[in-house]
Amino acid sequence: YQQSLAERGYKADEAQLKGIAALQRCQDEWSHYKAKRGNALTKMLRYPDLPKGVYMYGGVGRGKSFIMDCFFNAVPLERKTRLHFHEFMREVHRQLHELKGVQDPLEVLAKRMSRKHRLICFDEFHVADVTDAMILYKLLDAMFRNRMSIVTTSNFHPDGLYPNGLHRDRILPAIELLKQQLQVVNVD
């Protein structure tokens, strides 16, 4: 982070330091996780707990994406990806269409994703579509049960997702799950 700031001529921001501290904790936990997973005895006995993810929110232009990119580049993990949340949901809908008729397609989809990625970094987590709101809880729950960790940026606190949206009650369990599974950090 410090190196990237200097290279770009940016100045450190006090509010960003809360996000950086949360991401540093997450990165440290990933380093510890990798060390535990490297132990053959541990591999046979049980999986160590995955690092707790981070939900970093704040206004436009607060540097959330920049901070997350620094984290993504530094985290010692090969099975990771970073993408825009809208792009991710578009791909989810495409794959759900392919899985039409399959029992519990969101579980199948989460298992597929977990084979490729342990960590997913979402930029601009935002729900604007009723269809997304309706499937989000089952999708996130399946991802967490399939041992995936999430780090995300958003312009909104989780409670502010999909305000006044059609069938907003359908997204409330997903919001609670996000708050339970991720460390929520305000960078304003």
Language-model segments: which ranges?
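Short hydrophobic/aromatic beta-strand immediately N-terminal to the Walker A/P-loop
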Residues: G53-Y57
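Short glycine-rich substrate-engagement loop in P-loop NTPases that contacts/grips substrate
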Residues: K80-H117
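Conserved lysine of the Walker
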Residues: K64
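Phosphate-binding P-loop
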Residues: E29, K34-K36, T42-P51
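Post-Walker A helix-loop "phosphate-sensing" segment adjacent to the P-loop in P-loop NTPases
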Residues: N73-T81
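Hydrophobic positions on the alpha1 helix immediately C-terminal to the Walker A/P-loop
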Residues: I67, F71, H84
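Walker A (P-loop) phosphate-binding loop of P-loop NTPases
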Residues: G61
